[in-house]
Amino acid sequence: MYKTIIMPVDVFEMELSDKAVRHAEFLAQDDGVIHLLHVLPGSASLSLHRFAADVRRFEEHLQHEAQERLQTMVSHFTIDPSRIKQHVRFGSVRDEVNELAEELGADVVVIGSRNPSISTHLLGSNASSVIRHANLPVLVVR
């Protein structure tokens, strides 16, 4: 079906991502590769000179924690783990999804969405933003 699938995940809210796992696997079927992407907020505005070292250490800690949780998430899939790649980036979900999609020549994005609320108008804010700015098909899973 699809060769390259990007699946943005929040490793600190696994139940949201769990919904999308089976759909991503189905789309990957025979030989597709799923790229799990966790995006941490960028801290450029927090990088005051006298706190830069502390901010850097904190970012490294967050990145390490996210990488460990992504590794745990791989066990939720039934496909061969060699077909699941992991990415941790800093920035906005929307921008990082589009950047990774362009780098990889991705075919589709599979993203979980929260339950409806007034503030997000039926989609989670990340899912909504990804849909509005994506240059490729996006499958939203509830």
Swiss-Prot record:
Gene Ontology terms describing biological process: regulation of bacterial-type flagellum-dependent cell motility; response to stress
GO molecular function term, any single one: protein kinase activity
Disruption phenotype: Recovers slowly from late stationary phase growth, increased sensitivity to carbonyl cyanide m-chlorophenyl hydrazone, a proton ionophore and respiratory chain uncoupler.
Post-translational modification: Upon overproduction 2 forms are seen in exponential phase and 3 in stationary phase. Isoform 1 is the most abundant form in exponential phase, isoforms 1 and 2 are equivalent in stationary phase and greater than isoform 3. Isoform 3 is stationary-phase specific and autophosphorylated. Isoforms 2 and 3 are more acidic than isoform 1.
UniProtKB keywords: Phosphoprotein, Stress response
Gene Ontology cellular component list: cytoplasm
InterPro entries the UniProt entry points to: Rossmann-like_a/b/a_fold, Universal_stress_UspA, UspA
Pfam families xrefs: Usp
Induction: By starvation, heat shock and in response to some toxic agents.
Membership in a protein family: Belongs to the universal stress protein A family.
Subunit structure: Interacts with GroEL. Forms homodimers, mediated by the C-terminus of the protein.
Record's function text: Has intrinsic autoadenylation and autophosphorylation activities, probably on Ser or Thr residues.
Name used for this protein in its record: Universal stress protein UP12
Provenance organism: Escherichia coli (strain K12)
